[in-house]
Amino acid sequence: MKKHSPISFRQLLFGLGFLLTFSGMVLFLFSYRRDEKRFTNITAQMFVSDMKSNTLNMHYHLADPAAFGVTDYTPVLSCYDAKAALHSQAETENTLAALKAIRPKKLSAPDAALWKLLTRSLENTLALSGFPYYEEPLSPVSGTQSNLPILLAEYSFRTRRDVEDYLALLDQTDEYFASLLVYEQEKADAGFIMPAAFLKEVRNQCDTIVTKEALETDTHFLQTTFQERLAPLLKEQIITAEEASLYLAQNDRLLKTVLLPAYAALGDGLLLLEDDSVLPAGLASLPEGQAYYEQLLISETGSYRPIAEIQQMLTEQFSLEYEEIKKIADTYPEIIEHITQDNTESFPFHDPAQMLLDLRSRMAKDFPALPGPDATVTVKNVSANLEPYCAPAFYLTAPLDDTRANSIYINRSKTPDGLELYTTLAHEGYPGHLYQTVYHNRCFLDAGLNPAAELLWYGGYQEGWALYVEFMAYDYAASLLSEEGQKTAAALAQLEARNRSLQLCLYSLIDIMIHYENASFDQIAKILENFGVTDIGSARSIYNYIVQSPCNYLKYYLGYLEILSLQEHARTLWGADYTDYHFHRFYLDCGPADFLSLGECLESYEIPDPTPASSTAFP
């Protein structure tokens, strides 16, 4: 038997060193994995819990919930309850504490970025929860009473389960509206009652959006669209003819016996709250209204700039736009006589499909192509019942996992043809919301990123982009008109762009005046008079709209200015390597996010290869 040699001191030291190194590596890897595992567990729980708590929201986020771990859910509308709101606040505090216990440096780069976004978002949510009755879910501008029917009408049916979920949600609309009425009653008791004039507007909407006459004649859009959505399921034999008939009967019954009475009960309840002594006023008139406005501004726009700095940005941009308007008018003096004329017939395109095709062609060199197959879009008109209460146009966001079919709604009562329709389609379609959404969703899935990111919403990021590309579309239109030999019309398109920018800038400044500085109607009317708005009714409409929708104009226009600021910084950082294509790809790849996070991302951003693999080139 061979005798073992004794271990030398040097060998012993080497062995101990190896063991210590190995142990350190194990602890190091364990530490990293522990933080990653905790983050994965927390975010998975957040995502599934959020999806299960609101089926309507889940359906618009996910086509196939089970593929994202959302199973065994019960169809539910998220009804208001004061105790539930307090419980939700406590859950948010616990989640935030759990996230802050995680060390972001020990997460992967995508998870570390998400950690930052989640913590900032939850901090803002908690800050806003300290103002329980400042929010207005029944705003006359875009409240639940007008938004819910659209969401129901566009609720896609891919499976039998989708139809049954939809009917279950429709059956809960009475409880849902009743809970909103409770909120309004609690709000009134707390001294935050909605002005009587606004309550009258909401009641009028309740009386006209769903009517007995339309339901009795089977002409209401919630009847006709339901039948249209069932047809493909019947054709593909996902449901039988007998099942389709039963579903149709059930839908009619619920519309007549649940939704219609729900609207009536809501309107009657709001009537009891009307107090003619309560007049429209900004948030600054409320206790701690300025503090709430500051927090709401962060939430709605994603900008963390102080209000004084925002006012400075707006004032400087206003002066710039004003000077540009003067230059155009001086260069093309003949343009003045065309300003008040209807030029829609002279615009080269009248069909929305032609306009979208032209937009896609002109944007091709400056925007990354969509990954994967083409995304179809259907342009629809808003139902006549909803025209008075809807925005001029809107894009219904496609689910994360199904971007094949997309819908853009045009409110024909507020959006004429010609140049305005062209730029509106750019805002809502290409290169606006539709393009931004499809690009994000497909890249997100291809990269296998954490679905909890889909819980985050950044209005300034989205609407700022849509306004940014809308202004690009005015340039596209000017080029198109020049190609057609319409030089004056091309100059007019440039003037329209500058005028729209000036108007949105002015309204954004007025938003701050009303909600932060407590400007009265008389003060705002005087300002508007200086800019040509001499009709007192028009001034009142502008004032009321801004009172009803604080930060709404800023969501668009401050978002737009933040993008311009990022773009200017990118030019400085990248120097000769800067192109609009690279900047647009940065913005799309690093978002959605708040602008503070986007600025941080820009500092370390490396310009990638120009064309992603397996992409759909624009025509």
Identify the residue ranges that each predicted region occupies:
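Short, Lys/Arg-rich, polar N-terminal cytosolic tail immediately upstream
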Residues: 1-2
